[in-house]
Amino acid sequence: MSSLGTLGGARAGLGLLLGTAAGLGFLCALYSQRWKRTQRRGQSQSQSNSLDYTQTSEPGRQVRPLRAAPGEAGDAAVLSSLPRGQEVVLDRLEFVLTSLVALRREVEELRSSLQGLAGQIVGEVRSHMEENQKVARRRRFPFARERSDSTGSSSVYFTAASGATFTDAESEGGYTTANAESDYERDSERESDGDGEDEVSCETVKMGRKDSLDLEVEVALGLEPEAPEAGGSPGQEDVMPLLQQADELHQGSEQGKREGFQLLLNNKLVHGSRQDFLWRLARAYSDMCELTEEASEKRSYALSGKEEAEVALEKGNENAECHQWYAVLCGQLAEHEGIQRRIQSGFSFKEHVDKAIALKPENPMAHFLLGRWCYQVSHLSWLEKKTATALSESPLGATVQDALSSFLKAEELQPGFSKAGRIYICKCYKELGKNPEAKEWMKLALELPNVTKEDSAFQKDLEELEVILGE
């Protein structure tokens, strides 16, 4: 009986154990199925689209996967690889985006450059219009005006490029010539007493303008100007000694030219209506422009002299001296103008020099000026000639042979007229390949002393020609 009880208890324990194991197995199978179902659902929701965007479990939100840069997540960071086609599309999109950014930057730079260019053009046009308005007001109302300063300085109307060994220098006629010392070298050699004389000369100009203004105001109010102290109106016999003295002072030293300018300026109120007086006054302004070193003062003298020459031409168009000095002053004033005004002054210079030669063909200075103009034009670059042609209806045309003919004509009319002229002849012959003639004219140039600033400036070029041509 006891054995049967023991056997029954053992069977009951075994059944309980089997039931427990079966329950645990069922729970494990159920949990495994749920876990697999959750994994499959998460994979289906995280599939990537063709544009490499990942859809998250939250609807309406898309996040673009970031590529790990070297050093950000470590070199061992591994991202899920994309199909080959999607990688190519992504690279192309990145290239297009980079190109668009670069293109936008270039467009912005181009826009800023165009704005700057437009502003410069507008400024030049406005300056040109203001200058025209000033000229119109000056002709209508005889009032003096202040001169504007100018810091720019270039060649009168063209810059002749005659080689690497030659530089530009300023001539007696007021326009730039080739083969000379630079402005900086001349500034370093200027003496202090010359500065004082320039200041006195400027004060003289201001006083002369004031006296002229007073006279014009009296005429406008209907008042008669005061008669000269000697009594009576000035006649031919009264003015001729004055004009002869002015001519002598013009041919003299720098101090003599200053005294001649002062003499003419003091007598402008009395003889300012005479053409022969006015062109001499314009010539004196040209002399002062040559003697002055400050750019603003040079422009002021050149502008005043050109105005006097214009008034002289209004009194008669058949005076060769009026045309000659008007041309010279155009060249001097062009040194302080822009490229367009310089080119226009160049054509005006040529026109009035031709008229001066036609009216007085035996004048050596007019032929010398024409030769220098032809020499400079013959050395213009192709781009400079095209620019001048675009700004004017008449094309530029001059050769070294044309310049040589004019220089030889001046030498024929007056042998030894200019040392610079003989140096120009030497250069022309050298450029034409005629070295024996060039050497002969070099020797003739060495015989003449330095008279003008241009002669002194050409001394260095003459020494270089001696080395090139030989003794």
Swiss-Prot record:
<keyword id="KW-0539">Nucleus</keyword>
<feature type="modified residue" description="Phosphoserine">
    <location>
        <position position="50"/>
    </location>
</feature>
<keyword id="KW-1133">Transmembrane helix</keyword>
<keyword id="KW-0472">Membrane</keyword>
<keyword id="KW-1000">Mitochondrion outer membrane</keyword>
<keyword id="KW-0221">Differentiation</keyword>
<dbReference type="GO" id="GO:0005739">
    <property type="term" value="C:mitochondrion"/>
</dbReference>
<feature type="short sequence motif" description="FFAT">
    <location>
        <begin position="156"/>
        <end position="162"/>
    </location>
</feature>
<feature type="region of interest" description="Disordered">
    <location>
        <begin position="169"/>
        <end position="206"/>
    </location>
</feature>
<dbReference type="GO" id="GO:0006874">
    <property type="term" value="P:intracellular calcium ion homeostasis"/>
</dbReference>
<feature type="modified residue" description="Phosphoserine">
    <location>
        <position position="233"/>
    </location>
</feature>
<dbReference type="GO" id="GO:0005737">
    <property type="term" value="C:cytoplasm"/>
</dbReference>
<feature type="compositionally biased region" description="Low complexity">
    <location>
        <begin position="41"/>
        <end position="50"/>
    </location>
</feature>
<feature type="modified residue" description="Phosphoserine">
    <location>
        <position position="46"/>
    </location>
</feature>
<dbReference type="GO" id="GO:0097431">
    <property type="term" value="C:mitotic spindle pole"/>
</dbReference>
<comment type="function">
    <text>Involved in cellular calcium homeostasis regulation. May participate in differentiation and apoptosis of keratinocytes. Overexpression induces apoptosis.</text>
</comment>
<feature type="compositionally biased region" description="Basic and acidic residues">
    <location>
        <begin position="183"/>
        <end position="193"/>
    </location>
</feature>
<keyword id="KW-0493">Microtubule</keyword>
<keyword id="KW-0053">Apoptosis</keyword>
<feature type="modified residue" description="Phosphoserine">
    <location>
        <position position="57"/>
    </location>
</feature>
<feature type="region of interest" description="Disordered">
    <location>
        <begin position="39"/>
        <end position="70"/>
    </location>
</feature>
<keyword id="KW-0206">Cytoskeleton</keyword>
<keyword id="KW-0175">Coiled coil</keyword>
<feature type="modified residue" description="Phosphoserine">
    <location>
        <position position="44"/>
    </location>
</feature>
<comment type="similarity">
    <text>Belongs to the RMDN family.</text>
</comment>
<dbReference type="GO" id="GO:0008017">
    <property type="term" value="F:microtubule binding"/>
</dbReference>
<feature type="modified residue" description="Phosphoserine">
    <location>
        <position position="212"/>
    </location>
</feature>
<feature type="modified residue" description="Phosphothreonine">
    <location>
        <position position="159"/>
    </location>
</feature>
<dbReference type="GO" id="GO:0005634">
    <property type="term" value="C:nucleus"/>
</dbReference>
<keyword id="KW-0812">Transmembrane</keyword>
<feature type="topological domain" description="Mitochondrial intermembrane">
    <location>
        <begin position="1"/>
        <end position="9"/>
    </location>
</feature>
<dbReference type="Pfam" id="PF21033">
    <property type="entry name" value="RMD1-3"/>
</dbReference>
<dbReference type="InterPro" id="IPR011990">
    <property type="entry name" value="TPR-like_helical_dom_sf"/>
</dbReference>
<keyword id="KW-0597">Phosphoprotein</keyword>
<keyword id="KW-0496">Mitochondrion</keyword>
<dbReference type="GO" id="GO:0005876">
    <property type="term" value="C:spindle microtubule"/>
</dbReference>
<dbReference type="GO" id="GO:0006915">
    <property type="term" value="P:apoptotic process"/>
</dbReference>
<feature type="transmembrane region" description="Helical">
    <location>
        <begin position="10"/>
        <end position="32"/>
    </location>
</feature>
<feature type="modified residue" description="Phosphoserine">
    <location>
        <position position="182"/>
    </location>
</feature>
<comment type="subunit">
    <text>Interacts with PTPN2. Interacts with microtubules. Interacts with VAPB. Interacts (via FFAT motif) with MOSPD2 (via MSP domain). Interacts (via phosphorylated FFAT motif) with MOSPD2, VAPA and VAPB.</text>
</comment>
<protein>
    <recommendedName>
        <fullName>Regulator of microtubule dynamics protein 3</fullName>
    </recommendedName>
</protein>
<dbReference type="GO" id="GO:0030154">
    <property type="term" value="P:cell differentiation"/>
</dbReference>
